[in-house]
Amino acid sequence: RVADAYGAVLPTARMVYAIHKAPGVLHVGFKGFSPAKGETRDSTRLWLASNADIEKGLSGLGPWDPNRVVTDHKKDVVVGPTQVSRPSKVAIFGGWYPDGDIVQELNVKNHVIEYCDYSQCGRLVKPEVLIGGTLWPMHEVFLHPTYRFLLTGETGALTGQPRYGLKV
């Protein structure tokens, strides 16, 4: 709903990786935190500790520039073919440690759709991609049997849109 309200979409894992590798992005390395006994991974304490660490990392990058993308500090909730084939699961990908190692390869099996913890983020992207000089709506690219590969790394057309179901 938030993405829809802003006219945006969640990225695919392939897009998150491209953002990570793009020139000019600001890299704030991921730092993991463990819950205390009896605490869950979505606790306020873990979120605050993670946020403080991210703020510390940002302060070391010089003056704030709102035109630069900050990445690597969180795992992304992503979309892709999983949302069509496994609608009850949430796909998580990314986060990079300061040494460049990835935190989470694409995981499409282990987390129910309601899963949430301090280390995730919902990065929003514009719902258009430039292909051969033409702007394409992402929903059309997902359904295209050839161009879908650009977003997902997989060939063949989908039978539906990769998005998370709305629970009201």
Q: Model regions: which residues?
A:
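Conserved hydrophobic ligand-interaction patch in extracellular adhesion modules
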Residues: V2-D65, L124
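Repeat-unit-sized solenoid/scaffold elements
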Residues: F30-D53, V84-P87, A91-F93, I102-N110, ...
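Generic detection of intrinsically disordered/low-complexity segments and helix-coil linkers/edges
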Residues: R41, L58, V90, V141-P145
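Low-complexity, Gly/Ser/Thr/Pro-rich intrinsically disordered linker/tail segments
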Residues: H111, Y115-V168
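Phenylalanine-focused residue identity feature
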Residues: Y17, F30-F33, F93, F142, ...
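Extracellular C-type lectin-like domains
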Residues: D53-Y118
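Soluble non-cytosolic domains of exported or imported proteins
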Residues: R1, L10, Y115-S119
